[in-house]
Amino acid sequence: MNKHEIIQSLNQYVDQIVEQYKHEEFTRYVKSKKVTFEECYMFLEPRDPFIFGQTKSRWKQKITFRTYKHRMQTEIKCSCPDWNHNLKGKQVPCKHIFALIERYQSKRNHINNTIKGE
């Protein structure tokens, strides 16, 4: 997979997460508007691309979209207690994951233009 295909797959995955859980987890979605990030970046390794974020309250989030078959293809992780105790097994996003997705979506055009320029 080249970088453009990885970005397209990642875009589809984060859109799917938001559409699937936006109404179901509405309170978490609304609370995500208050989350602020200390650092946030995207790593485009061909086999294991991911988006990473760390909030001001030091919780760490990671959205992974793997391209090889012997591991879980898509995975979300957060270090907050709400996600670890209630949502981890179901792979349901917490407010921090929703905030990370929203941050990624706001930078999507810039990322696409950067990839096209390479």
Model features per residue range: what roles?
Residues 1-118:
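Long, low-complexity, compositionally biased intrinsically disordered regions
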